[in-house]
Every structure is written in C-alpha cells, then in structure tokens.
Design a protein with these regions (language model features):
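Nucleotidyltransferase catalytic core that binds NTPs
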Residues: 1-154
Length: 154
C-alpha cells in the first residue's frame, strides 16, 4: 500500500505556507506522497470571495509541478457540492485501491472536527496528521490514537 496524505483546502490561492507544510509532512513522516485536494466548496466555511474553482486548481498545479512528492487532486470537482471528506475519501479508495489515505489538517480546521460529516467513521477508520497552528488547539481529539500532531514550521 502506498501511504498518501490528503491535504484538503480551498487554496484561495495556494501559497508558500501550504507548500512548506505539505513538503514538511512528506519529508518528516511516513507518507510517500501528499495530494493537494482542492475543494471547490467547503461546507463548514462561509462563502467568501473565492477565486474561480478552475483558477485555484490551475494555480495549485503550477505550484507543485516541480515537486514530485506533491500532486494536485481534483476529485472534488467531480463530486456533489459541497464536498465532504468522508465522501471524497471513500471515492478515492474506490479509484485507488492500492493506497492508504491519511488526512492532513491544521489545528484551526481540526478544532471543529466534531462537526464533520460522519466524523465517527473518519476517526475510527483513518489516520490524521494534524499540523500545529500556534493560535489554535487541536481540541478533544488531540490524544486520540488515530491522531498524530505534527510540529510543522509556519
């Protein structure tokens, strides 16, 4: 099984901070690849002034084109919107049976994990690599056996 990290986000736009975190997690964990999963619509975030979906996707592709350990994944462009992590990961498992997927998120996102669709199935079925955001606490799940806190540089 190829261990692949899924780094979800709006990437509005993708920036050096995203790339540093993705590269760091790839380099200092057991992940063989990190996929940047561009989310057209996050169900837990208000509608902000987002760049067009295709623009965000293209910028992400350009940002990682010279880094073979990072790949852009556009699966959520082909799924019903809004996109839910559980639906995306189940589809990816169906499409890529030779991979073990790990969910990458920041403590700013993970603090609301209890609001995610089917969070119980996610926490019991998948590993989470959570990178520390100094101003946010990982919440009640920080000590869960499925959660690994990563001290990534910011």
């Amino acid at each position: 099984m190829i261990k692949t990290g899924l780094f979800f986000g709006s990437f509005n736009p993708i920036h050096i901070g995203h790339l540093i975190i993705a590269s760091y997690i790839h380099q200092f964990t057991d992940l063989e690849e990190v996929w940047i999963v561009v989310s057209p619509k996050n169900p837990l975030k208000p509608e902000l002034e987002l760049l067009e979906e295709e623009e965000r996707l293209k910028m992400a592709q350009l940002a990682v084109e010279h880094n073979p350990s990072l790949k852009v994944c556009d699966i959520e462009f082909y799924l019903p919107k809004p996109s839910y992590t559980i639906d995306t990961i189940l589809r990816l498992e169906s499409d890529y049976p030779g991979r073990q997927f790990v969910i990458i998120a920041g403590t700013d996102i993970f603090k609301d994990f209890h609001r995610w669709k089917e969070w119980e199935n996610l926490i019991s079925g998948y590993q989470f690599y959570i990178y520390n955001r100094p101003e946010y606490d990982a919440g009640d799940f920080a000590n869960h056996p499925s959660v690994k806190i990563i001290k990534a540089p910011l």
